[in-house]
């Protein structure tokens, strides 16, 4: 996330920014192809979870707000979005489902948008896989996305109905990084690990006391999810 992107404010800065982004993209992805798009100021990053089956049906499973980021990479996600209105949710959900149907999409996927301060939304990309932040969707609609993608692959049809949140969930990504060194990776030994628990708390992680975080991979080592009746309660649980 965030690689090969540059904001250009002045025409005279264009060539240097283009060359820099091309070099970064080539190094990161082995592909330096570039394109230009409108820069959306004060955006929110809101994505729609969808699922499609082998029989021409698709539905959406609500949105996730992923606007809290560093270096264009997600840190905190929540659902439902505090910025969302029922009208915007319906419009974005309809657009996401339409996109899935247009390519006969099978499986779970995420259609990602930027939303400006006037609630105009712009398509960014579609992730044709399970997302890091999928647990918050599972928690608020009681829907197992991993199970669903296996069933869809096995030829089981979906109902085709859209799902809407009954609860509020927040996910914090737990990263082995040093915030005092511009979030530089911080590999090493976890000497002691004590994870939180209780009602409305979910921890997804592979680490344990004595685990050594390697320097070779992404810095994320866990996800902490809180679920509650309201956003305020979910935030309070996360603070605790």
Regions found by a protein language model. Give the residues of each.
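ATP-dependent carboxylate activation and anion-phosphoryl transfer catalytic cores
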Residues: 1, 7-240
């Amino acid at each position: 996330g965030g690689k090969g992107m540059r904001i250009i404010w002045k025409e005279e800065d264009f060539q240097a920014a283009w060359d820099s982004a091309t070099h970064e993209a080539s190094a990161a992805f082995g592909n330096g192809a570039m394109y230009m798009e409108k820069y959306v100021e004060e955006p929110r990053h809101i994505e729609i979870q969808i699922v499609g089956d082998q029989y021409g049906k698709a539905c959406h499973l609500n949105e996730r707000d992923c606007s809290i980021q560093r270096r264009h990479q997600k840190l905190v996600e929540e659902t439902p979005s505090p910025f969302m209105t029922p009208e915007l949710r319906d419009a974005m959900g309809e657009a996401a489902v339409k996109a899935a149907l247009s390519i006969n999409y099978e499986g779970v996927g995420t259609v990602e948008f930027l939303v400006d301060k006037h609630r105009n939304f712009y398509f960014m990309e579609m992730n044709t896989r399970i997302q890091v932040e999928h647990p918050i969707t599972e928690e608020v609609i009681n829907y197992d996305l991993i199970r669903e993608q296996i069933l869809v692959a096995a030829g089981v049809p979906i109902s085709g109905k859209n799902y809407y949140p009954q609860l509020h969930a927040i996910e914090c990504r737990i990263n082995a990084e040093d915030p005092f060194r511009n979030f530089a990776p911080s590999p090493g030994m976890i000497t002691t690990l004590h994870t939180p628990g209780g009602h409305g708390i979910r921890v997804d992680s592979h680490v344990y006391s004595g685990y050594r975080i390697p320097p070779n991979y992404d810095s994320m080592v866990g996800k902490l999810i809180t679920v509650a009746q309201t956003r305020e309660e979910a935030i309070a649980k996360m603070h605790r």
